[in-house]
Curated annotation (Swiss-Prot):
The name this protein goes by in its record: Protein MGF 110-2L
Secretion signal, residue range per the UniProt entry: 1-31
Organism: African swine fever virus (isolate Pig/Portugal/OURT88/1988)
Keyword annotations from UniProtKB, A to Z: Early protein, Signal
Designated gene of the protein: MGF 110-2L
Pfam families hit by this protein: v110
C-alpha cells in the first residue's frame, strides 16, 4: 500500500510539472530566458501585428514578421527527493534551441 501512495505522489508531481508549457512559462523562467535569448517566441506578446517583449519593458514594440522570432522549447530534468512524508522537486532547465540562438 505504501508503494501506491508513493507512486501517486510521484505522478501528481509529474502532472503538475507538465502543466507548464513553453508557451506559458513560469515568471522566474521567463525572466531568465528572455534576458539572454530575446528571439524566443515565448518572450513576446503580439496583438494586431505588433509585438512587445514580456520581460524587457523598455524595449520598443516590433512588427510581428520583421523581428526574427524563433519557436524555442524548454526542457526540464527533475529529480524527486523524499524527506519523510514530504516530496521536493529540483529541476534544471535547458534548451538546445536557445543555445543555438545565443551562438548565432
Amino acid at each position: 500500500m505504501r508503494f501506491f501512495s508513493y507512486l501517486g505522489l510521484l505522478l501528481a508531481g509529474l502532472t503538475s510539472l507538465q502543466g507548464f508549457s513553453t508557451d506559458n512559462l513560469l515568471e522566474e523562467e521567463l525572466r531568465y530566458w528572455c534576458q539572454y535569448v530575446k528571439n524566443c517566441r515565448f518572450c513576446w506578446t503580439c496583438q494586431d501585428g505588433l509585438c512587445k517583449n514580456k520581460v524587457l519593458k523598455d524595449m520598443s514594440s516590433v512588427q510581428e514578421h520583421s523581428y526574427p522570432m524563433k519557436h524555442c522549447m524548454i526542457h526540464r530534468q527533475c529529480k524527486y527527493i523524499r524527506d519523510g512524508p514530504i516530496f521536493q522537486v529540483e529541476c534544471t532547465i535547458q534548451t538546445s534551441d536557445a543555445t543555438h540562438l545565443i551562438n548565432a
